[in-house]
Amino acid sequence: MWNCRWLSALPALAAAILINGCANHGSHAVAKRQTGESVVLVGEAPANLAFAPLRSGPIAVRSTYRDGLPQTIHYQPGQDYLLDTSGQIRRTPGSRIPDFGTNMLYGKEDFRHDQFPGFGNRGFFVYVDYAHRYKWQHPLANPELGVARLPKTRQKLEAGEKVRIVAFGDSITAGGDASEPGLIFWERWTAALRVNYPRASIEITNGATGGDATVQGLQRLQEKVLQQKPDLVLIGFGMNDHNREGYGVPLDKFAENLRALIGRIRADTGAEIVLFSAFPPNPKWHFGSHNMEAYADATERVAREEHCAFADVYHYWMSLAARKKPEDLLANNINHPNDYGHWIYFQALQALGL
């Protein structure tokens, strides 16, 4: 479980976090709806939701992120689970909810995923809808890193013109473990842009490649980005760069590579750029350096210095996950977000204000 230790280093805007003991949650706050929050449950042990649910609000617990699918199982309170007012949920004896304790990676420390064929968490998630009263502000440290740095894109959208976007990065950006294409974070963001700017013609291309770090990104840039002649490029690296020595990219080289990507994109296309950070992988994974905060900070620093927009996925993720287990959000149990995790990325892009 992540904790609140990092809050002291954040500005006040980022410190309005959604957890007991760190939250701003007066009874006067407007009720909010949490949809499809994911959690895995071990035996009959309790697990935390991100927030404490309202007693009076409707609660739904099911087997799929999206409701109403042919395979969706709706779990019943008392029969399948117990949920208390503090936001703790647990399986009942004889529950139909899968027991995460039977996952092949459960309890493994410093595990190497290549030794466990078929690893993953997808069959173990339950998804919870509930209402809460927690007040929250987007953890965007500086609004100037948002839409203010995307004036050409905003102008084109408002004028109803064609806007070409390329999503560039690693397997997360490629859509890693989203259950359907429409739930990939940048697909969700594009759909929201189309609602906000109905006269504009918005095209988005998936230019991401699984397993890539910034080194491979530079090698693929011409084919995946420059040839598309984009107006806006979303750049998300760091997950593979941050891996331990011998598998990743050193921090200073990572920042240097981001600057090189930005320079080449601007020189060749004139496109505006959004950099976005990544979240911490499973801390029990052997290959992670578990220094993602430094890579997220480097991404933000490059965005500031190179006058790019910045989507702060790292702190958004940490704020929502502070009461939760890493496995609650990891579709592959390593470093791919599940559908709820893709929603967190989507929210970070929404915070740009475009």
Question: Where do the PLM segments sit?
Answer:
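Short, solvent-exposed loop/turn segments at secondary-structure boundaries
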Residues: 176-181, 216, 245-249, 285-290
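C-terminal motif of bacterial Sec signal peptides marking the signal peptidase cleavage site
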Residues: 20-21
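Bacterial N-terminal signal peptides that target proteins for export
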Residues: 1-10
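Serine-esterase "nucleophile elbow" of acetyl-processing enzymes
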Residues: 134-210, 219-229, 233
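Catalytic His-Asp segment of secreted/periplasmic serine-dependent ester chemistry enzymes
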Residues: 278-354
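Solvent-exposed loop/turn segments at secondary-structure junctions
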Residues: 171-175, 209-215, 239-244, 271, ...
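Active-site segments of SGNH/GDSL-like serine hydrolases
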Residues: 236-242, 262-296
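Extended beta-strand solenoid/passenger and fiber regions
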Residues: 24-104, 110-139
